């Protein structure tokens, strides 16, 4: 029979910091009792983004380590999760649970030059380089700002021959074990991920247009299910209701144009799918026109809360202004919104989307939306169409074809202006 235990949550009081979980990047500590830890906290307790910043320092006989909870080198922990540590007392059968925070410890490597400057005699100064002599003068007679800059530069220097040899040996072992081809492939994938932060997940080797930008990656199944009630008004729209939307200009030109053809769909399942997609697309277009986003701007009576939360999480960034945290639309997030709008519109329009209408709805420059469409692998064609005033004008159409189109950057040099 399995043993049972009761647990008691202690949390972390205002005086204590809770449990600290550390992970050393270069190995495992053999004797943890010989490590001295020091925790530093940010003094600015008024700013909600900096008051929780901490730095943890560890001293050992051989190396010193440092870690923090606010830089890019920290552990990739979800900000939406809380972490705990439990200590089980086998005699009483009780487990005490405490709040925990994780730190990734990095070694601080110095070249040894710092100690030599204090011990070497002045007679040995001619053998030093010009940079070493300047550093010695700064340490003796420099201003506080110069000394801080020098200290920062030395902390960032990794000039140890032992480390270089170890890194070279490790690189040789990795190349021998995995092979050069595999490493080049990994580097290409990493570079592709870094350059596509604002694009929807894309399969450039897709065999069908619908698999290039999969629908579930654009609108999650949870959001899609929640849109059933929200899109009911579009699904059951009448001629009078559509005319009222046109007069009140509640939606953009692209959505209104698709709503005209929505009433001609006889299949109930296809009609419901198009209505949900148009409702979500209309919400993204309205979101792209905002600078500062509040929940009340998105959470309208017909908007599901899960859709509101997803839009705030995926398409806004947190900024600190006027003493409080705000959600805003940055340049990168707006580009991401435009890319998702184009991808969803492709699914709505059988993978041929009128980029000119979307550009006007989002108040973008034509060159900007064409640039994003080209990065997404779309073919751009010009098609003559009639506007509401029966004037013939050229519209840019984006087509998704297999394989996706790859545009090479122009390598032409800029022409010099003649005087």
Curated annotation (Swiss-Prot):
Phylogenetic lineage: Eukaryota, Metazoa, Chordata, Craniata, Vertebrata
GO molecular function, one term: DNA binding
Domain of life of the source: Eukaryota
Main location: nucleus
Protein name per its UniProtKB record: DNA-directed RNA polymerase I subunit RPA49
One annotated Gene Ontology cellular component of this protein: RNA polymerase I complex
Gene Ontology biological process: RNA polymerase I preinitiation complex assembly; transcription elongation by RNA polymerase I
Alphabetical list of InterPro entries matching this protein: RNA_pol-assoc_fac_A49-like (IPR009668)
Subcellular location: Nucleus, Nucleolus
TM region positions: none
Subunit field text: Component of the RNA polymerase I (Pol I) complex consisting of at least 13 subunits.
Entry's family note: Belongs to the eukaryotic RPA49/POLR1E RNA polymerase subunit family.
Swiss-Prot/TrEMBL keywords: DNA-directed RNA polymerase, Nucleus, Transcription
PANTHER family reported for this sequence: DNA-DIRECTED RNA POLYMERASE I SUBUNIT RPA49
Function: DNA-dependent RNA polymerase catalyzes the transcription of DNA into RNA using the four ribonucleoside triphosphates as substrates. Component of RNA polymerase I which synthesizes ribosomal RNA precursors. Appears to be involved in the formation of the initiation complex at the promoter by mediating the interaction between Pol I and UBTF/UBF.
């Amino acid at each position: 029979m399995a043993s049972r235990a009761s647990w008691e949550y202690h949390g972390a009081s205002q005086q204590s910091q809770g449990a600290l979980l550390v992970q050393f990047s270069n190995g495992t500590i053999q004797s943890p009792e010989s490590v001295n830890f020091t925790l530093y906290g940010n003094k600015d307790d008024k700013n909600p983004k900096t008051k929780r910043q901490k730095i943890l320092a560890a001293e050992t006989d051989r190396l010193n380590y440092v870690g923090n909870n606010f830089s890019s080198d920290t552990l990739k922990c979800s900000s939406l999760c809380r972490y705990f540590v439990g200590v089980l007392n086998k005699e009483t059968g009780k487990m005490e649970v405490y709040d925990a925070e994780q730190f990734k410890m990095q070694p601080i490597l110095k070249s040894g030059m710092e100690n030599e400057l204090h011990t070497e005699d002045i007679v040995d100064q001619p053998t030093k380089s010009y940079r070493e002599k300047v550093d010695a003068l700064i340490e003796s007679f420099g201003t506080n700002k110069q000394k801080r800059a020098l200290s920062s530069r030395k902390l960032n220097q990794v000039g140890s021959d032992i480390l270089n040899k170890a890194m070279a040996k490790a690189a040789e072992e990795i190349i021998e074990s995995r092979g050069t081809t595999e490493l080049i492939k990994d580097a290409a994938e990493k570079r592709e991920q870094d350059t596509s932060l604002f694009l929807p997940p894309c399969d450039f080797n897709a065999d069908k247009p619908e698999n290039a930008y999969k629908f579930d990656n654009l609108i999650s199944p949870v959001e899609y299910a929640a849109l059933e009630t929200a899109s009911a008004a579009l699904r059951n729209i009448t001629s009078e209701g559509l005319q009222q939307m046109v007069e009140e200009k509640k939606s953009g030109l692209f959505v209104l144009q698709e709503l005209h053809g929505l009433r001609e769909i006889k299949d109930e399942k296809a009609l419901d799918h198009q209505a949900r997609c148009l409702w979500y697309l209309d919400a993204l277009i309205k979101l792209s026109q905002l600078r500062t986003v509040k929940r009340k701007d998105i959470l309208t009576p017909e908007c599901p809360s899960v859709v509101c939360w997803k839009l705030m999480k995926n398409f806004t960034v947190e900024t600190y202004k006027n003493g409080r945290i705000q959600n805003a639309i940055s340049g990168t997030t707006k580009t991401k919104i435009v890319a998702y709008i184009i991808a969803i519109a492709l699914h709505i329009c059988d993978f041929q989307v009128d980029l000119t209408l979307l550009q006007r709805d989002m108040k973008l420059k034509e060159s900007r939306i064409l640039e994003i469409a080209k990065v997404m692998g779309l073919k751009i064609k010009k098609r003559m169409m009639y506007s509401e005033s029966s004037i013939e004008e050229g519209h840019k159409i984006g087509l998704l074809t297999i394989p996706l189109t790859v545009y090479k950057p122009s390598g032409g040099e800029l022409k010099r202006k003649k005087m």
